[in-house]
Amino acid sequence: YAKFAVSCRKVETMTQQLRFIPFKSRSDKGWAEAWALYEASFPDCERWDGTGYDRAFGDPHFEADGIWRGDEFIGILFHWNAGDYRYVEHLAVSPRLRGQNMGSKALAAFCQGRRVILEIDPPEDEISVRRQHFYQRLGFVANPYAYIHPSFRRPFHPHRLVLMSYPEALTYEEARGFADFIRERVLRYSEHENPELPRL
């Protein structure tokens, strides 16, 4: 399939090869399965609609990767290139692969040689605590800054998140620059017209 030749990053693991292949449009091979996984994995407030992706595909900072093991689609990793770091916006692995550590393998592979930032819910219950520990086992650090993120879709409900960074903590200036990047670039593809958040 021709699209497989475009910017394919291969990552060797102990028993298999993972490939990160960027989608360029919603007509690409695997997008329907990727979209179904996306909708099943994230609530409405954390998702864009399809037209937002149509516009974002033309942004050189954005990449929507399908994760493949051979010819088998296994997950998604949607991320942004902010120059000094990558922002992982959405990561999900097919539920049929639970127990195989594919999420940790894919994220560890993606992080090699990079600075990476992502957001998680505050560790206030068993699930959110487990999620934070998952990222910490991979080398991510929780940052102490007050960070409020608006939802992507109406009605907007700002919510507190924790910034996790790899392989080291963020300075305040770095965290503030990240908030500016989200507000000024990422949210232009959401339903916001003039977002005021996030800010530090």
Q: Model-predicted segments: where are they?
A:
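Conserved catalytic-core motifs of GNAT/GCN5-like acyltransferases
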Residues: 119, 132, 136-156
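Conserved beta strand-loop-helix elements of the APE1-like EEP
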Residues: 163-170
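A short helix-loop-beta-strand connector motif used in the catalytic cores of GNAT acetyltransferases and
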Residues: 56-66, 157
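Conserved acetyl-CoA-binding loop-helix of GNAT-fold acetyltransferases
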Residues: 93, 99-112
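Conserved beta-strand in the GNAT
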Residues: 66, 71-81, 85-92
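Short amphipathic alpha-helix that is part of the acyltransferase structural core
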Residues: 12-52, 161-163, 177-199
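Conserved GNAT acetyl-CoA-binding A-motif
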Residues: 112-127
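Short, Lys/Arg-enriched N-terminal segments with co-localized hydrophobic residues
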Residues: 1-13
